[in-house]
A protein has these predicted regions:
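Histidine/lysine/aspartate-rich catalytic loop segments that bind and position anionic ligands
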Residues: 61-88, 92-94
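Glycine/aspartate-rich loop-and-adjacent alpha/beta segment that forms the canonical ThDP
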Residues: 99, 109-175
């Protein structure tokens, strides 16, 4: 695969990404590499048992070169994450599994940069960054709508979304 430099694999919603990341992180440690491994999970994805098995593995092997990033927007393809199969409280569970946890606003780039920097300094345990986000943020017809999970907009919706996001970007940049 590896069509994007630095991205070794894409995974689906069944929790396989963190298991692959654990293998990559352990392999790097065994080979004496200083590389870091990052994996992105959704809050619906962490309902899968494989995720928690991988968390045990990461903690047991002290994979301090592993950073798990969780998008906690409360929605999944079937609706409200808490109603489908609640993984909450995410932070408490990850800490119980031996992770260093940073809970941040996933729309705050300064907080994201700080959490990623902190992850590099943690020794002896993996890091999880739990990012509270809003699905479809700043797109009027997508925001907080589970129905947009895995659905592409049509041409008119795409144009509207891009116009709204461009307006928001201009606002943030003071234009």
């Amino acid at each position: 695969m590896n069509t994007v430099p630095g991205v070794d694999r894409s995974t689906g919603s069944l929790g396989q990404g963190i298991s692959a990341a654990c293998g990559m992180a352990l392999g790097a440690k065994v080979k004496g590499r200083q590389s870091r491994v990052y994996t992105l999970l959704g809050d619906g994805e962490i309902q899968e048992g494989q995720v928690w098995e991988a968390c045990m593995f990461a903690s047991h092997y002290q994979l301090d070169n592993l950073c798990v990033i969780i998008d906690n927007n409360g929605l999944q393809i079937d609706g409200d994450v808490a109603k489908v199969m609640s993984p909450y409280p995410i932070v408490d569970k990850l800490e119980a599994f031996g992770f260093h946890v940073e809970a941040i606003d996933g729309h705050d780039f300064t907080a994201i940069e700080a959490a990623l920097a902190k992850a590099k300094t943690v020794k002896g345990k993996p890091t999880a960054i739990v990012m509270k986000t809003v699905k479809g943020k700043d797109v009027s017809f997508m925001e907080n709508e589970a129905g947009w999970h895995g659905v592409a907009p049509n041409d008119a919706q795409y144009e509207q979304a891009m116009a709204e996001l461009t307006a928001k970007l201009n606002e943030l940049e003071g234009k």
